[in-house]
Amino acid sequence: MSRRGTAEEKTAKSDPIYRNRLVNMLVNRILKHGKKSLAYQIIYRAVKKIQQKTETNPLSVLRQAIRGVTPDIAVKARRVGGSTHQVPIEIGSTQGKALAIRWLLGASRKRPGRNMAFKLSSELVDAAKGSGDAIRKKEETHKMAXANRAFAHFR
């Protein structure tokens, strides 16, 4: 039994312009080589492009996209008796959001296009509509969990 106390859960800070935690989470995930100002530029350009495309509040589109991509359940590899089973586990809200953001950014990086802001805005709009690679990834994960329901007791 460890004598150390449990680490306190950090609350996500909000970004300077929109005062939104989701935007800040996106910025921190898109960050490469410590270039945070470039990450902010990419996100803010993507938000402007969303505003131009949909003519609605871009933050609501962002929220809707992340809510649509957030998985409820995932599979985790568990070794039992010499064989590895994919065990379905429920995911908490913060972990689900983190996964959703990771999938959205991965899908937007794979997209063909000019720059990251354009690709990210396209992926977010598609995810808000219920299509796109990130949504497909969520459905794939849910299918895997449903297929491996028999191993749920290995948790």
Curated annotation (Swiss-Prot):
Coiled coil: none annotated. One of its GO terms (biological process) is translation. GO terms for molecular function: rRNA binding; structural constituent of ribosome. The keyword Mitochondrion does not apply. The keyword Ribonucleoprotein applies. It comes from the Eukaryota. Keywords: Chloroplast, Plastid, Ribonucleoprotein, Ribosomal protein, RNA-binding, rRNA-binding. InterPro entries: Ribosomal_uS7 (IPR000235), Ribosomal_uS7_bac/org-type (IPR005717), Ribosomal_uS7_CS (IPR020606), Ribosomal_uS7_dom (IPR023798), Ribosomal_uS7_dom_sf (IPR036823). GO terms for cellular component: chloroplast; small ribosomal subunit. It is found in: Plastid, Chloroplast. Pfam families: Ribosomal_S7 (PF00177). One of the primary rRNA binding proteins, it binds directly to 16S rRNA where it nucleates assembly of the head domain of the 30S subunit. Belongs to the universal ribosomal protein uS7 family. Part of the 30S ribosomal subunit. This is Small ribosomal subunit protein uS7c.
